[in-house]
Swiss-Prot record:
This is RecQ-mediated genome instability protein 1. It comes from Danio rerio. The gene is rmi1. Pfam families: RMI1_C, RMI1_N_C, RMI1_N_N. It is found in: Nucleus. Its main location: nucleus. Residues 238-255, 342-353 have a biased composition (Polar residues). InterPro entries: RMI1_C (IPR032199), RMI1_N (IPR049363), RMI1_N_C_sf (IPR042470), RMI1_N_N_sf (IPR044881), RMI1_OB (IPR013894). The keyword Secreted does not apply. One of its GO terms (cellular component) is nuclear body.
């Protein structure tokens, strides 16, 4: 084999497919192809195609040839402007309930589960219609990062096998190490990696999301996948280098509605609530889950939630898919008063689907049985991954100080038992926690207490003040990324007692902790 022949193939891969490979692998691959052909003469075009086929079936970790910009997975805000090819290890549809997806794969789903004796509430015209969202775990063989289906991408589907090769076409916006992908940003080249078919099968990924035991038998793969081929001869060469093997990590679960479509409603339409809102029929059954709205949030708004601390953390904790949220109004027999405040979902639950890598070494050594003093907790900001890696849930109510943002608002803002009620999921980038926003916090954001609101809403002259306060509260919650004092009860659910800007001292403490963990 001549050196010129290898250079021709390398130039063809770069010019036609934007594929970059190490010369050692290319040399070994060409030698193996010629040995399989008994050293017979192979036309250059056919040789090019066979090398491409071998690359499509190769785990890029074996090549260890970086093509992505350095430390792009840690970038808070940047743009990937060039073209490059990466490998998709796994993908997950985070717009669908993980449990329902697992049932469909196992063939245990039942259509009767969707039948209810209670009349379902009709979606209102101004409510945003949710869309599909796929989260992709990507690698160039050296760096791991995620891709989010920011706009519908017809070329992608949940049946793509692990190891599929993708061509990324810039410019692509990158936020917090996540590629925000549109249809024009991605081309599916095909391929698969045999070793990853079982490790990252859909059933295993979903089991990890739900916190269920992983299935021991391999998932039955759909028809039409690329057939496995013999070893290209590069394995012996790659075995001499230190390789990083993929690790299957659990993904936090996201509970969503099943009937998603591809329509999108801009934020302006979503926020325009009609004047006769209160005249519309309301769903007064407090046991029913309120569907979350899936907004199309512009990139400028995403920039407002950038975390000022550069922290690499582990996968978050999981939500319980079977948990029922009983309102306190059930105890006293009163029905909650729903206020016209649509629930929002930041980034389409992007952060809830993230698989992160490194954990700051701040795990709790023990779990105290005594209640922590809130002032003492405020002195030391904590990470959710560290708290949840210790004794969790705590054996007694405890107050923690977290730098966090609101990932999802659960349900509608309402008045129940004379106080404001609103559920949410918060994240500090290392984990996720279901919380209730305290009445004091909501009253400060709205500008009126629940009792004052009841009175003012009956006064037509001042009703607009309440509506303005609620809209202000919504905007503040959407952009909120600050220090939160959170009280966690024995069930692991929290209450956000207060929120305040991060101080210089707290910022320095967290930066110091991250640097110590990296050393």
């Amino acid at each position: 084999m001549s050196v010129g022949e290898v250079q021709v193939i390398q130039a063809w891969l770069r010019s036609e497919w934007h594929i970059q490979v190490p010369p050692a692998w290319l040399d070994a691959c060409v030698n193996w192809i010629k040995e399989e052909a008994d050293r017979a003469s192979i036309p250059q075009s056919q040789l090019n195609q066979r090398v491409l086929e071998q690359w499509l079936l190769t785990d890029l970790r074996d090549l260890a040839h970086p093509v992505l910009p350095e430390r792009i997975s840690e970038a808070q805000k940047t743009v990937l402007s060039n073209r490059c090819c990466v490998q998709m290890d796994s993908l997950l549809d985070v717009s669908q309930p993980a449990y329902n997806q697992l049932q469909r794969i196992r063939g245990t789903d039942c259509s009767n589960d969707q039948v209810s004796a209670v009349t379902q509430e009709t979606q209102r015209p101004w409510e945003a219609k949710p869309t599909r969202m796929l989260m992709l775990q990507l690698t160039d063989g050296v760096q791991n990062l995620e891709g989010m289906e920011y706009r519908p991408i017809p070329a992608l589907n949940a049946n793509l096998p692990p190891g599929t090769k993708l061509q990324l076409v810039g410019p692509i916006a990158v936020r917090l190490g996540v590629l925000l992908l549109k249809a024009e940003n991605i081309k599916v080249l095909g391929g698969e990696v045999e070793q990853l078919l079982e490790i990252h099968s859909q059933s295993r990924v979903l089991c990890g999301t739900l916190g269920l035991p992983e299935e021991t038998h391999p998932q039955q793969e759909p028809d039409g996948l690329v057939a496995s081929v013999a070893d290209s001869g590069y394995s012996s060469l790659a075995s001499e280098a230190s390789l990083r093997h993929p690790q299957s990590q659990p993904l936090p679960q996201i509970s969503r509605q099943d009937d998603w479509d591809m329509d999108e409603i801009p934020d302006d339409d979503f926020r325009s609530i009609p004047d006769h809102f209160d005249d519309l029929p309301q769903n007064n059954n407090p046991l029913e889950d309120v569907p979350e709205d899936f907004d199309d949030i512009p990139l400028d708004e995403l920039d407002n939630v950038m975390c000022p601390i550069d922290v690499e953390v582990s996968a978050g904790t999981l939500e319980d898919p079977e948990r029922n949220k009983h309102d306190s109004s059930l105890l006293n027999g009163s029905k909650p008063e729903e206020v016209s405040f649509p629930s929002r979902s930041r980034l389409g639950n992007t952060y809830q689907s993230r698989t992160l890598n490194k954990v700051p070494n701040t795990s709790l050594a023990s779990c105290s049985t005594s209640t922590l003093d809130s002032s003492a907790c405020k002195e030391t900001p904590m990470y959710l991954c560290s708290l949840q890696a210790g004794c969790w849930p705590p054996k007694s109510p405890q107050v923690f100080r977290l730098q966090a943002f609101i990932v999802t608002l659960v349900g509608n803002l309402r008045i129940s038992g004379g106080v404001w009620k609103l559920g949410a999921t918060i994240s500090d980038g290392s984990g996720y926690l279901d919380v209730d926003l305290s009445d004091n916090m909501l009253s400060e954001l709205i500008g009126f207490s629940a009792a004052e609101t009841r009175v003012l809403r009956k006064d037509l002259a001042r009703r607009g003040e309440v509506d303005s306060g609620i809209q202000h509260c919504q905007r503040e919650l959407v952009d909120m990324c600050c220090m939160m004092s959170v009280q966690v009860d024995l069930t692991g659910r929290g209450v956000v007692l207060s929120a305040s800007p991060i101080s210089d001292r707290e910022c320095s403490e967290m930066q110091k902790r991250v640097k110590e963990a990296r050393r």
